[in-house]
Amino acid sequence: MAENIENNGCSQRDSAEHEGYAKARRSFNLIWKERGSAQPKLLEAILHKDNFNRAYKRVKANKGAPGVDGMTIEEALPYLQEHQQELTNRIYRGKYTPSPVRRVEIPKPDGGVRKLGIPTVIDRTLQQAITQQLVPIYEPLFTDGSYGYRPNRDAKGAILKIKEYAEQGYTYAVVLDLSKYFDTINHEILINLLRKNVKDERVVQLIKRYLKSGVMENGVVIETEEGSPQGGNLSPLLANIYLNEFDREFLKRGVPCIRYADDIVLLAKSRKASERLLESSTRYLEEKLKLTVNREKSRTVSVFAIRNFKFLGFALGRNRSGIYVRVHAKSWEKFKSKLKELSSRKRCQSIKPSLERIKVYARGWLNYYGIASMKSNMNDINGWLYHRIRMCVWKQWKCVRTRYRNLRVMGVPKDLGWKTANSRRGYWFTTHTVVMNMAMTKERLINSGFYDLATAYQSVHVNY
């Protein structure tokens, strides 16, 4: 089935004869009289067949679970092909009501939960169509210090910017923690911010309906008087629009501000200056933007503090060569813990699938953290993982005869092979013996699918 939504010519909407379109223009006339502005065409651009098709393909690529109506992404295509004109007409007439989002709770590393709101596939597609038209409007308005949910910007760019400022003497950071940011965005403030740059009031009203669509939890729809639930395609952009006021305010004050979504760092050249910044920034966020700053987690700290400065999993260090990006200790701990889980003897009953799982996880981790300086650490953890895999192989061989036979195939002399095969030493001890070093070389394991972390790191890090 073709992935284009339109089935029988959505371009009819662009014609003056389109019945729904004509009704739509009449029904929105009151809005324009109240606003006193010319009728812009942003809603038409959002609902244009090309933009809507692109939005659906993006939603399909992102996959995701069904919303409250239970409709899957695969089921949405034939539905849209049949009903898109009806959907479009309802939006133009101002009669479209988004469905409530489905509440999903995701465990957080700190023991809490992150509440997500999953819209229906139809609403996700429409939200994506809106986002695609709003991004070109807002991108020029966002500051250079904003890195989250933006084209060609990422966490690596954010930590590199902090490093750049640190090299200029900004070595004290104000780390701000917002409590339940997405769930506490003030609707009135956000709508007023949107009206500054979105001149098509129909679009503003449509976004407002999404904000007010409600949340279904345990079969009960709960009204949403504040917040923009995480999980929708539009929420990241709205979150950036809201905090852009904070970014621009402190940019005007000459304060370096680095932000990734709701992770905020302000930089100063002295501890006293950072303490003043903590007070003024907290006051602005709480009084002007009606947000809640978590005062227990928000703090001032040196950017070189070994454990206390952490931003997006990264930290900074310095030596005789200068300032460098490093992986924070907690991020290292999580990495090693996950590798330990993937290479456990219980998980490694079949070696090749286990090696593939380790490869997929480690490659993703390195693509994110590869910017950091960690050659020595990576060599250490690579050696540790190498022995973990050998331990799994040794356990998989189980009986003495299998161990002896495989050791002989790998070139181990008879006497050493027999002695090792009969050893009652533990798995970990055995993997460090001369015989095992002789038999299960790193090259042999690599040929079997072992992902050499040290080599992979070097190939990734060289790009930085």
Task: Cite the ranges covered by each PLM segment.
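Short, solvent-exposed helix-loop connector elements
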Residues: 223-226, 324, 340-353, 365-377, ...
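Conserved polymerase palm-domain catalytic core
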Residues: 90-105, 109, 141-303, 308
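A conserved non-catalytic segment of reverse transcriptases
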Residues: 212, 288-356, 361-363
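Non-catalytic, polymerase-adjacent accessory regions of viral genome-replication enzymes
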Residues: 1-81
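Extended C-terminal regions of large enzymes
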Residues: 388, 397-464
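Core structural elements
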Residues: 47-52, 100-102, 109, 349-369
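Amphipathic alpha-helical blocks
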Residues: 75-98
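Short secondary-structure subsegments characteristic of cysteine-rich extracellular domains
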Residues: 372-395
